[in-house]
Regions:
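Active-site neighborhoods and metal-handling regions in enzymes and metal-associated proteins
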Residues: 1-378, 382
Length: 387
């Protein structure tokens, strides 16, 4: 029962041991990744794949440097996206967001330990930067019941021993998101808890070469998924039997086909449901000569979030003049603001010099001028009042 198939894997001797992204050429491997469909599309597009071994090491170095710069003993992570960044390993990502059973401790000397599901320690063994696999970080009531305090004490003591050995006994510990009992148990051991999200966000603020390659690949895969969704939409709407949910399901399927993982939101609406924005995708049947608007918000290949917003006019007639003007005004807004984006530009300069929307669009405008994925920076509402 303890002998995992991963320990007995065989690789085709006629093929290279490694794929172009420097991961094992093993169809039965534990490590997830992009599909053959995605790889073929990237090759046709002339995209260069990331070196995942190098990307993982870059991220590990970034996190370790930020720990040392702040004179912390270590960084304790529970957020599954931070764990993905630190280890590139996954385990029931969405379930983990509301049942935090995984944790990673990165010590000041670079020693990294993961607490995972007890029966699946092998899920991160492909990454040599993860030195130990343990279990016991599931500090939520559904798992532990009234014994949760005892489990938290055991976990906190393990952290203490690791910091003693690999963090020089420094009790300044950065933590991102932790359950209440875990917090109390760490504080009872005299840990001074610091803001772990500040560490992880600033670590991610600078991308390495291979991360940029991964982002390009993921973005291209998302664009191909959008293309497939558009083709079906344009061919089927005239039959008046295609719902918003039907259209949205195509993006889900095409994302998964390329090795993507999930979609964060349900932002696809049609006709009168497009305004006000933020209504969620529903059963409404899309009619001929209507607008469809969506925001991908998907976690795609390599775990990269790709957030693309689009609107389509679907029909055999022309849109109304006011819709054409709104689209042209929106396009001008995007292009003018894009021109300002360059290295060294301060956030305050972006808001001060931003393209101004017409007065009639002020009430329904988006909540921020521009944003990234997972590194969310929004200018103040005062600065945005007329942008």
């Amino acid at each position: 029962m303890n002998e995992h198939h991963s320990n007995n894997r065989k690789i085709d001797p006629l093929k290279s041991f490694l794929l172009d992204d420097n991961t094992p050429n093993d169809k039965n491997r534990v490590e997830i990744g992009p599909t053959l469909l995605a790889r073929r599309e990237w090759e046709t597009a002339g995209l260069e794949l990331p070196d995942l071994q190098a990307m993982r090491k870059f991220r590990w170095k970034r996190l370790t440097k930020h720990i040392l710069d702040r004179e912390y003993g270590g960084l304790l992570m529970f957020d599954p996206l931070n764990i993905r960044y630190a280890t590139d390993s996954t385990n029931m990502q969405l379930w983990n967001t509301h049942n935090p059973f995984r944790a990673v401790l990165l010590c000041a000397d670079g020693y990294m330990v993961i607490w995972d599901y007890k029966n699946s320690p092998f899920l991160s063994e492909f990454n040599p930067l993860v030195k130990e696999q343990r279990s016991g970080a599931d500090l939520f009531y559904f798992d532990r019941g009234d014994k949760i305090g005892d489990a938290a004490d055991v976990f906190a003591n393990e952290v203490r021993l690791l910091i003693s050995e690999h963090g020089n006994g420094n009790n300044r510990l950065a933590v991102d998101k932790i359950m209440l009992h875990g917090l109390r148990s760490l504080e009872a051991l005299d840990f001074k808890l610091m803001d772990g999200e500040e560490v992880t966000e600033k670590s991610r603020s600078i991308k390495g070469i291979d991360e940029i390659k991964a982002m390009r690949c993921a973005s291209y895969a998302c664009e191909k998924a959008i293309y497939e969704m558009e083709q079906v939409t344009r061919s089927e709407v005239c039959n008046e039997n295609l719902s918003e949910n039907d259209i949205w399901s195509i993006l889900h399927a095409e994302n998964i086909k390329r090795g993507g993982e999930w979609i964060e939101t349900r932002l696809l609406t049609s006709g009168p449901r497009t305004n006000p924005w933020f209504q969620e995708c529903g059963p409404r049947i899309v009619q001929n000569n209507e607008i469809i608007a969506f925001d991908t918000d998907l976690v795609g290949a390599y775990g990269i979030c790709v957030d693309i917003s689009r609107t389509w006019w679907i029909g055999d007639q022309s849109p109304r003049p006011d819709m054409i003007y709104a689209m042209r005004h929106a396009h001008e807004h995007i292009m003018k603001n894009m021109e300002m984006l360059k290295p060294g530009v301060h956030m305050s300069d972006l808001t001060k010099n931003a393209h101004k929307l017409d007065e009639k669009y002020q009430v329904g405008k988006y909540s921020c001028l521009m944003h990234g994925c997972l590194l969310y920076t929004s200018p103040s509402p005062r600065d945005l009042r007329k942008s």
